[in-house]
Amino acid sequence: TFHCTQAVGKVMRKNKAGVILNIVTTYAYTGSGYVVPSACAKAGVLAMTRSLAVEWAKYGIRTVAIAPGPFPTKGAWSRLAPPGLGIEKKMKDRIPLKRLGEHIELANLATYLISDQAAYINGEVVTIDGGEWLKGAGEMNDLDKIPKAAWKLLQMKRKKKK
């Protein structure tokens, strides 16, 4: 993300315009068990987003980010919330809206943030998680509450993916 941002930033600075939209995660600022490498990387992207918002504003460049909470994806969910273990229900129960995010909601937010209608938004990280982080975020923290047999199965699945 850093190298890509630097490369596109050169062009944007030359053109005196642009919007950089980064996708982080709620656990970039709350932390979460079982996803430490991702949390560290996304926290760095979050800091870069805010830092460049100050540094590159003089070039007409805005940097913004979206911090999604639980949105089902094939990658992470197949390893961390496989079907049949009750993890998805536990996650939904933590969210005040009692549901997971829908990808169209994420797309709509992204579309708005890069539009001219959001021209005064700079350096902001918008959380989209149904209110989960307000209740003590880190959607993967609940993994330690699953039964031991399910945990063993989950660990075996994670090792197979590597």
Model features per residue range: what roles?
Residues 2-5, 62, 99-128, 133-134:
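C-terminal substrate-recognition "lid" of short-chain dehydrogenase/reductases
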Residues 5, 41, 49:
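Active-site helix of classical SDR
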Residues 10, 54-58, 119:
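Alpha-helical segment proximal to the catalytic Tyr-Lys
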Residues 25:
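Residue(s) in the substrate-gating loop at a strand-loop-helix junction
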Residues 29, 67-78:
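Short, flexible catalytic-loop segment of classical short-chain dehydrogenase/reductase
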Residues 30-36, 58-59, 98, 116:
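Active-site loop immediately N-terminal to the catalytic Tyr-X3-Lys motif
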Residues 31-40, 51, 76-79:
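Active-site loop-to-helix junction immediately N-terminal to the catalytic Tyr of the SDR YXXXK motif
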Residues 111, 122-162:
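Short C-terminal tail/terminal secondary-structure segment
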